[in-house]
C-alpha cells in the first residue's frame, strides 16, 4: 500500500510541472571537465545507497569535493535553470558535490534524489530540491542518463553537457558497455515544500 501511495503522489506532482529537465549541451570546456575528473585521481571509494554498498542498485565509484571553485562553477547554472524552466523553487544552498566514475558494467538503477519533504531533512533544515549532473567525458558507450515516464527520451548528453531536474523525478544511469563514464553530480537544497 505504501508503494501505491508513493506512486500516486509522484503522478500528481509530475502533472504539476511542465518542464522535467533543463539542458545545456557541451557547455563546459574539455579543460574544465578534465580538472573535475582529476579531483578523483586516487581517492575513489565505492558508492553507497543509504550508507550501504548495494551492487544490485548501484555500481560506481565516487569522490566528494568541497572545492569552492566547483560550487562557484555550478551554482549559476542551477539558478538559471530554476528560473527558465519555471520551477522557481526556494533554493538556499548547494549541498554536496560528487565526482562519479562508472567503469564497464557500472550503473545506477532507478532512484530519486529527494522528495522535498519534512521526512528527509538534512541537519540544516533543508532538503534536496534540484539535482544536477554534468557529463565530463564522451569516450564511453552505454551509461545513458534516463528519466522514467517521459514520452520523449532525454537526448544523449555529451562531454561538458549539464542537466538540471527536480530531485523528486525518478532517473537512472544505464550500464556502461565500453570505456569509463565520468560525471559531476550535485544537489541544491531549500526548505521543504509546503
Question: Can you annotate each of these PLM segments?
Answer:
Residues 75, 79-194:
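Catalytic core of non-heme Fe(II) oxygenases with the double-stranded beta-helix
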Amino acid at each position: 500500500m505504501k508503494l501505491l501511495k508513493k506512486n500516486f503522489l509522484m503522478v500528481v506532482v509530475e502533472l504539476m510541472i511542465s518542464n522535467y529537465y533543463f539542458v545545456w549541451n557541451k557547455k563546459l570546456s574539455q579543460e574544465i571537465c578534465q580538472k573535475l575528473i582529476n579531483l578523483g585521481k586516487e581517492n575513489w571509494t565505492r558508492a553507497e545507497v543509504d550508507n550501504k554498498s548495494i551492487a544490485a542498485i548501484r555500481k560506481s565509484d565516487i569522490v566528494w569535493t568541497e572545492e569552492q571553485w566547483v560550487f562557484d562553477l555550478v551554482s549559476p547554472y542551477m539558478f538559471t535553470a530554476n528560473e527558465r524552466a519555471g520551477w522557481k523553487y526556494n533554493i538556499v544552498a548547494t549541498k554536496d558535490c560528487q565526482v562519479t566514475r562508472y567503469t564497464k558494467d557500472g550503473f545506477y538503477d532507478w532512484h530519486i534524489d529527494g522528495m522535498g519533504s519534512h521526512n528527509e531533512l538534512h541537519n540544516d533544515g533543508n532538503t534536496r530540491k534540484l539535482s544536477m549532473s554534468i557529463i565530463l567525458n564522451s569516450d564511453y558507450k552505454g551509461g545513458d542518463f534516463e528519466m522514467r515516464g517521459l514520452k520523449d527520451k532525454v537526448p544523449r548528453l555529451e562531454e561538458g553537457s549539464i542537466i538540471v531536474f527536480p530531485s523528486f523525478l525518478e532517473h537512472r544511469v544505464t550500464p556502461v558497455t565500453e570505456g569509463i563514464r565520468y560525471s559531476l553530480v550535485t544537489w541544491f537544497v531549500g526548505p521543504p515544500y509546503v
